[in-house]
Swiss-Prot record:
It comes from Picosynechococcus sp. (strain ATCC 27264 / PCC 7002 / PR-6). Induction: By iron stress. Low-potential electron donor to a number of redox enzymes. Its cofactor is FMN. NCBIfam families: flav_long, PRK09267.1-2, PRK09267.1-5. This is Flavodoxin.
Length: 170
């Protein structure tokens, strides 16, 4: 079984904690290997056919700084044949007009480079007005709001991972 590479960017540590929880839900580091994009060469994305991309939305709809620094370098990675799931951290109350935008920006870019998106997540249960991560009434990946709905995070991660396992052949 090939490992899943989980690449995340984090400003305050929240997205790293979410990445660790996702890794644990999959069964640990034998299945999911974690990479902080601040500390790894973007070339490492090439080593995995199955990826999970994690990014918080920062400020007003912006990419987290490490993902922003790597954004143009993504053009040098061929994502054809790669299965990719996304998760994002955001604040649906304070930033209802751009909730999870960073996740949507990364998904759009990587899809344009050949990546196949899996793990779409329902928008029901969230209170936001607009999101670049919304496609056909669903988020492109798991939307986490630790600011306003922390009590739902563990349950959402478990349900999302259960949805992803068949898509990743587990």
């Amino acid at each position: 079984m090939s490992k899943i590479g989980l690449f995340f960017g984090t400003q305050t540590g929240n997205t790293e904690e979410l990445a660790q929880a996702i890794q644990a839900a999959f069964g640990g580091s034998d299945i999911v290997e974690l990479f902080d994009v601040a500390e790894v060469d973007i070339e490492a994305l090439r080593d995995f056919d199955q990826l999970i991309i994690g990014c918080p939305t920062w400020n007003v709809g912006e990419l987290q700084s490490d993902w922003e620094a790597l954004y143009d370098d993504l053009d040098d990675v061929d994502f054809s044949g790669k299965t990719i799931a996304y998760f994002g951290a955001g604040d649906q109350v304070g930033y209802a007009d751009n909730f999870q935008d960073a996740m949507g920006v990364l998904e759009e870019k990587i899809t344009s480079l050949g990546g196949k998106t899996v793990g779409q997540w329902p928008t029901a249960g969230y209170d936001h007005s607009e999101s670049k991560a919304e496609r056909d009434g669903k988020f492109v990946g798991l939307a986490i709001d630790e600011d306003n709905q922390p009590e739902l995070t563990a349950e959402r991660i478990q349900a999302w991972v259960a949805q992803l396992k068949p898509a990743f052949g587990l």
